[in-house]
């Protein structure tokens, strides 16, 4: 474990769960990720209580036009795999597969064992919702675990817990366990660009849901995971 942070947010915990269970917000909330991942055509799987979607990394979003030079996010992905972007001679469309092949071929010298992972798991994000309030972003080299906790006194607030786990190469020393870091509401300390961007929407979303003019949500097919989540909660409340 390399990180352990709790932030107090001005929204209900279920709004936070929803924010990490659909991908269409990427274009507006995380525009930098359009140069790094596929955000339109995602596999969505629903289970009895849980759900997931699979996000291909190492591809340009169909929302952006291809450019001549490899964009910085894809260069970072190449470097993260141990490759030199300057020496990469393939096309941009082949970066995802090239990273998969390189990580597979060099796993032993990198001190890692990917033998039980298929190729897509070497690059992509496997985003799970473990009902009712745990989200994981699962990758070959790391795991980001989020817990969305109700506030004990105020339904318009919540606690967002972040744990970061990283795969330590064989033979390397494990880093010391991080100390728990608490961020009260209004803190300007960053949780990381992507999480900060998600958090920036949630207080406004909560205000909108509290409006007298808000009758309820109409959820589209893109929001299958949200529909499944709230249906499961309703089923529990009706028991």
Regions from the PLM with identified roles:
Residues 1-239:
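C-terminal catalytic domain of Rieske-type non-heme iron oxygenases
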């Amino acid at each position: 474990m390399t990180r352990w942070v709790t932030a107090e947010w001005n929204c209900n915990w279920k709004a936070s769960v929803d924010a990490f269970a659909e991908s269409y917000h990427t274009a507006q909330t995380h525009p930098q990720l359009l140069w790094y991942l596929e955000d339109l055509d995602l596999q969505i799987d629903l289970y009895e209580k849980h759900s997931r979607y699979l996000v291909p990394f190492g591809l340009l979003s169909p929302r952006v036009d291809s450019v001549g030079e490899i964009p910085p996010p894809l260069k970072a992905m190449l470097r993260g795999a141990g490759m030199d972007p300057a020496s990469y001679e393939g096309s941009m469309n082949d970066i995802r597969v090239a990273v998969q092949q390189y990580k597979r071929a060099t796993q032993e010298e990198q001190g890692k064992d990917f033998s039980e992972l298929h190729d897509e798991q070497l690059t992509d994000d496997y985003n799970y919702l473990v009902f009712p309030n745990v989200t994981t972003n699962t990758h070959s080299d790391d795991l980001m675990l989020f817990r969305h906790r109700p506030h004990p006194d105020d339904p318009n607030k919540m606690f967002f817990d972040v744990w970061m786990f990283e795969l330590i190469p064989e033979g390397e020393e494990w880093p010391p366990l991080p100390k728990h870091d608490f961020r009260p509401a209004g803190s300007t300390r960053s949780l990381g660009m992507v999480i900060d961007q998600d958090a920036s929407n949630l207080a406004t979303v909560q205000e909108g849901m509290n409006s007298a003019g808000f009758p309820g949500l109409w959820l589209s097919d893109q929001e299958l995971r949200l529909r499944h989540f709230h249906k499961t909660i309703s089923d529990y409340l009706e028991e």
